[in-house]
């Protein structure tokens, strides 16, 4: 696909990332993707690793870059990929995280219970597809694993997808945990297709072993670090307390979007059938949560204020 240069992003980890004009450029500039600039990739891990300030937008661009490299590599090995398929799978990886909210897994445990970010991503992709007159139809097919060339879906969501290859290396870079610094270029070079499924050449087995080890170590040292987990539990407790107070009619400061979820019972059926849920969800980002916590830290309810002040001042529950 040679449509001219639409935009160039200078990013850590992979350097310059070129976004061609057309559909992919329109996706990157779309407010739903730009919203990811205001959502940190690793949530509350910055309490342990202060350098981990990178965003889901940066991750989406990095995954897009790796997808472009993977498509080029697979095509060079004789695997025929139409330009339309290449563009669609690039669109799918750009959009794979748009359903994340602030501190995504915290929200799934508190104010948006029972609705996963993957389901919300699909809802938002379908919404964008209507806006773009069906240009994302093929990307959605690939995302849902409904396209005959199954390896394209596996590049988006699989055991060796571009999502994992980017976030492990990116999170390793920003946290300084070197064990997660995988050789993504080497792994991509070893990819091939057999019977429409993604496979790895035998000489790439060592790289895959390193990848699996790196993933385990990153979960151990970063994603499930006891301090991060304790901080997350405090946030869950604060939001649940706020929701309890809201159910009793107590007036709480919150942005309109956050207030919608605090003062309404949202289960999967309501979320899927009430358009206001999605409209309010896409207005949420990290700023809504931190601003609310800052104000709640002086609330007259001692439980809410103690939890909120602890979040603001990093006075964290101790995990023994």
Protein language model regions, located:
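Histidine-centered, transition-metal-coordinating active-site segments
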Residues: 3-88, 102-108, 112-320
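Short alpha-helical catalytic segment bearing the HExxH-like zincin motif
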Residues: 89-94
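Short active-site segment of divalent metal-dependent hydrolases/proteases
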Residues: 95, 99-100
């Amino acid at each position: 696909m040679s449509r001219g240069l639409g935009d160039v992003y200078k990013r850590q980890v992979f350097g310059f990332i070129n976004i061609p004009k057309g559909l992919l450029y329109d996706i990157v500039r779309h407010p739903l993707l730009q919203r990811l600039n205001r959502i940190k990739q690793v949530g509350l891990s910055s309490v342990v690793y202060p350098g981990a300030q990178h965003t889901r937008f940066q991750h989406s661009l990095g995954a897009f870059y790796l997808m472009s490299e993977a498509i080029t590599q697979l095509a060079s090995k004789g695997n025929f990929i139409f330009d339309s398929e290449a563009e669609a799978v690039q669109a799918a990886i750009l959009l794979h995280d748009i359903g994340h909210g602030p501190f995504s897994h915290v929200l799934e445990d508190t104010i948006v219970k029972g609705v996963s970010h993957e389901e919300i991503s699909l809802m938002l992709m379908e919404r964008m597809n209507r806006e773009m007159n069906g240009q994302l139809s093929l990307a959605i097919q690939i995302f849902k694993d409904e396209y005959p060339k199954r390896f394209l879906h596996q590049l988006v969501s699989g055991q060796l997808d571009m999502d994992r290859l980017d976030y492990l290396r990116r999170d390793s870079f920003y946290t300084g945990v070197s064990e997660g610094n995988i050789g993504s270029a080497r792994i991509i070079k070893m990819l091939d297709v057999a019977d429409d499924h993604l496979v790895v050449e035998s000489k790439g087995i060592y790289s895959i072993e390193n990848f699996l080890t790196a993933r385990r170590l990153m979960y151990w040292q970063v994603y499930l670090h006891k301090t991060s987990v304790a901080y997350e539990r405090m946030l869950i407790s604060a939001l649940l307390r706020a929701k309890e107070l809201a159910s009793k009619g107590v007036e709480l400061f919150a942005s309109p979007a956050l207030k919608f979820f605090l003062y309404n019972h949202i289960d999967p059926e309501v979320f899927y059938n009430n358009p206001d849920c999605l409209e309010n969800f896409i207005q949420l980002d990290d700023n809504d949560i931190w601003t609310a916590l800052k104000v709640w830290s002086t609330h007259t309810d001692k439980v809410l204020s103690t939890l909120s002040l602890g979040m603001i001042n990093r006075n964290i529950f101790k995990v023994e």
